[in-house]
Amino acid sequence: MEMGLKFKCICCGECCRRISDEDSTSKGLPLFEWEIEKIKKLAASKNISIQVEPIDLVLDKKSRKYFCTGYVLVDEPCVFLKDNKCLIHKDRPIVCRAFPVARNPEFFDNVPSLSCFSNCPNFDFKAFLRESLGLEEGKAFKLPKKKILEEYSKTFDKEIIKNSFARDKILSQFDAIMATLSKEGLIDIGLVNKIPKGIKVIPFLEFLVDEKFITVDEKNKISNEFAT
């Protein structure tokens, strides 16, 4: 199998068969809250049964409300994979559009590592780090951000870079909002591994509206900005 320093999808379907990392506690395709309704409609149009579950669970001890910052489309291989083709390719979620970049370099201070990428058997990520960025495993390096971004743009298509940036921007905004609310004493959050039976989990933006931290219009603006 040919390896190269220019990433090109060969439609092997491996990314759809093995979506999660081996150590991941949530097996399936990550989704944002505004992607769920669209995914459900796409599944219904193709007579596909799906299961969506909340992940990244949080309890606000002040309001006693449980919310989540993400969801997962349960099942591996992906339910939309058929004959090595994605049945919803034009409407696929942002995590798929960003593949194989799991973390955009705009959002971390250190140099990239293998953990910044999703697994693809048809691309040599170690060679990319070594040959394009001059990085060697086990050694400390400092590279100019400009150099890292230039090499990413040479290796990965614009759409991949754009969508990985958008995805990380969302996650960064969510973290910043929670950090600000916590610092101001408006929420008191604790991470939750398992939701008690009968407890409703609401999406993060809905929680912010319920607690009057943002308006419905502001919620819709955020959702519409990132909706694909």
Q: Which residue stretches match the model-derived regions?
A:
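Short loop/turn segments that flank or connect secondary-structure elements
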Residues: 1-228
